[in-house]
């Protein structure tokens, strides 16, 4: 399954473009722009599993840095600052990674 099976390709393109500048990433705005906020809980979980590149059941910090590439292969990597900010917002239990429920909460709070 690809991201465009779940989200509109044009919405993804616009959202990735909106955050092309380093240190401009805002996960709340991004999730709204790609249409993730409006998706069902099941679809949000499917997006999580696409972003979980190593299929560990978690999005670890190294995967988080490439989150935009999970939506669009030609997107930029997040800066270290952006990655840490996103991890802090999503990692509710402090284990250094984001699980599917934490990701769902992160999207819902957007």
Curated annotation (Swiss-Prot):
Q: Which UniProt keywords apply?
A: Acetylation, Calcium, Metal-binding, Muscle protein, Phosphoprotein, Repeat
Function, as annotated, reads: In muscle, parvalbumin is thought to be involved in relaxation after contraction. It binds two calcium ions.
Q: Which PANTHER family match?
A: PARVALBUMIN ALPHA
Q: Keyword check for Oxidoreductase, yes or no.
A: no
Family indicated by similarity? Belongs to the parvalbumin family.
InterPro entries, per the entry: EF-hand-dom_pair (IPR011992), EF_Hand_1_Ca_BS (IPR018247), EF_hand_dom (IPR002048), Parvalbumin (IPR008080)
Cite the Pfam families for this sequence: EF-hand_7
Q: Which residues bind Ca(2+) 1?
A: 52, 54, 56, 58, 60, 63
Q: Where is the EF-hand domain?
A: 39-74, 78-110
Output the lineage of the source organism: Eukaryota, Metazoa, Chordata, Craniata, Vertebrata
The species is Macaca fuscata fuscata (Japanese macaque)
Q: Which gene encodes it?
A: PVALB
List of residues binding Ca(2+) 2: 91, 93, 95, 97, 102
Q: What is known of its domains?
A: AB domain, comprising of helices A and B, is involved in structural stabilization, protecting the hydrophobic core of the protein. It is required for high-affinity binding of Ca(2+) and for Mg(2+)-binding.
Write the protein's name. Parvalbumin alpha
Which sequence positions carry the modification called Phosphoserine? Answer: 2, 24
Location of N-acetylserine modifications: 2
